[in-house]
Amino acid sequence: MNVFKNFEKKIKKSLESSDIKGKNGEDLDLSKITVDPPRDSSHGHLSTNAAMVLAKSTGLNPRALAEKIIELLKNDPSVESINVAGPGFINIKLTKPFWQDLIKSMLEKGISYGRIPMGQGKRINVEYVSANPTGPMHVGHCRGAVVGDVLSNLLQFVGYNITKEYYINDAGKQIEVLAHSVLLRYREALGQKINEIPEGLYPGEYLIPLGQSLAQEFGDKLLTIDKEEALSIVKERAIHEMMSMIRKDLAALNIYHDIFFSERMLYADNARAIRNTINDLTLKGYIYKGKLPPPKGQNTEDWEPCEQTLFRSTDVGDDQDRVLIKSDGSYTYFAADVAYFRDKFNRHFDEMIYILGADHAGYVKRLEAMAKAISNDKAKLSVFLCQLVKLFRNGHPVRMSKRAGSFVTLRDVVEEVGSDPVRFMMLYRKCEAPLDFDFAKVTEQSKDNPIFYVQYASARCHSVFRQAQETLCIENISNDKIIEHLNRLTDDNEIFLIRKLSEYPRIIEQAVVHKEPHRLAFYLYDLASSFHTHWNKGSDNLNLRFIQPDDRNLSFARLGLIQAIMNILSSGLAIVGIKAATEMR
């Protein structure tokens, strides 16, 4: 139950059946009415902008209109008090029985509380990570990996049918570079001296085992056979080994994709998928032969001062037309990307989401353009860019990894601090904002470490149940016993916690609508903080402690509050991909 949405519907229904109309007697547009938690919790439990957004169309002063709306709502049995604030906001305080009934509903739903049926089985493809198979994943990939995975979990939670997809860029020049880099390590394994790694090749030590493996299997055969044949063998082995490494890196972060789509599939059968895509766009009038002007202030490999096959992407919102076939007949990277999108579209997804690095910002318009052209503007496409992650240790920048060659690997980070802190902290900023990740901060046991603070709240909740079993001499505490006494939850601090719990469905809905999984991480920390504040009050006021040995019924009621907190922490953390702690060690 979304308290805020329900009350919004209640306000709209009351207005529809009232005599409050537009200036000319017309029905009002109620679509902009919202109900939210007030910024200052002391002002009430709910706040609505109804009078503010309707004042102009009714011709009434916002405060005067607010008074009329209050008359419609004041006799609602769930309303304890209602008043106008500031320029015309309406603040509402709900009765304690309302909150007691709500926590009963939370407990009955268990960890399904907040699972709003928004998706209705619609199919969404979420493509994320898609790192080049040229080495281990670095920390730059980590943020997009977590954001994509948690967004997928979030959408799945509310009823969407999600496909998690990884696009393997295994047909470009970087694979040629990888193969030559591996051949160098192969020669090294055979005893040849290679000195410094030539510029342009991958210098990381992660390729040494692959070179040794090839030396054991082939001896010096790869140096004596046809160079192209040797290169082909090495490419296959290198791609397989790099993708195996990447899969293990992702698994260390608890990330598992449903589909790994190889770019080489698009080039199979003489690039049939790409040819069909270009033919399709030709029939729609988007393909022509022409010359592009040179790019201003930069060089791109696709630009040539001669005629090429171009995609008229400016007709569908792009800044410039794009090259699909170069003058030598070879396809551009973008041609494969268009064919890949067409493949996705033909798999009948209702929406396609791309999670990309910030360095792909210039790619967004061409993605949107190709989607419009391929689908006749029917495809729903969303692109999200993840900003950089900077690593620190006690405030000092972290050195690069020798094993990787020029970057810190994802595995290095996960092995040092664990996957849970990495996942949570990668969500603890909006993805479009840069993120500083400090190894010292994410391992300290304090409220300044968000994942610790959230897990500490979960562990404390479990400890209350263990204490209750000992103090109240009850082995199993049933939901029925708890629900029977929820009317004992009357303290303002308890009501405040129930109010905080009631925000969970709203947070889920907003995170889904805006596709912003960081909202969930913020909420979990906020809930944990509210719980810890209440816990600490029990140190000064024994009457606020959850277990009251002399009042079993009140203890049962408060255990209901604890159970509801445990459920939401467990539910929210599961979406983030983290198991809620039962104790801290």
Swiss-Prot record:
Enzyme Commission identifier(s): 6.1.1.19
GO molecular function, one term: arginine-tRNA ligase activity
Annotated family: Belongs to the class-I aminoacyl-tRNA synthetase family.
SUPFAM superfamilies registered for this protein in UniProt: Anticodon-binding domain of a subclass of class I aminoacyl-tRNA synthetases (SSF47323), Arginyl-tRNA synthetase (ArgRS), N-terminal 'additional' domain (SSF55190), Nucleotidylyl transferase (SSF52374)
Assembly notes: Monomer.
Name of encoding gene: argS
Xref: NCBIfam families: argS (TIGR00456)
Keyword ATP-binding: yes
GO process terms (BP): arginyl-tRNA aminoacylation
One cellular-component annotation, GO: cytoplasm
Motif segment ('HIGH' region): 131-141
Compartment(s) of residence: Cytoplasm
InterPro entries (alphabetical): aa-tRNA-synth_I_CS (IPR001412), Arg-tRNA-ligase (IPR001278), Arg-tRNA-synth_N (IPR005148), Arg-tRNA-synth_N_sf (IPR036695), ArgRS_core (IPR035684), DALR_anticod-bd (IPR008909), Rossmann-like_a/b/a_fold (IPR014729), tRNAsynth_Ia_anticodon-bd (IPR009080)
Catalytic reactions of this protein: tRNA(Arg) + L-arginine + ATP = L-arginyl-tRNA(Arg) + AMP + diphosphate
Primary enzyme class: ligase
Pfam families per record: Arg_tRNA_synt_N, DALR_1, tRNA-synt_1d
Protein name: Arginine--tRNA ligase
Keywords: Aminoacyl-tRNA synthetase, ATP-binding, Cytoplasm, Ligase, Nucleotide-binding, Protein biosynthesis
Entry keyword annotation includes Aminoacyl-tRNA synthetase: yes
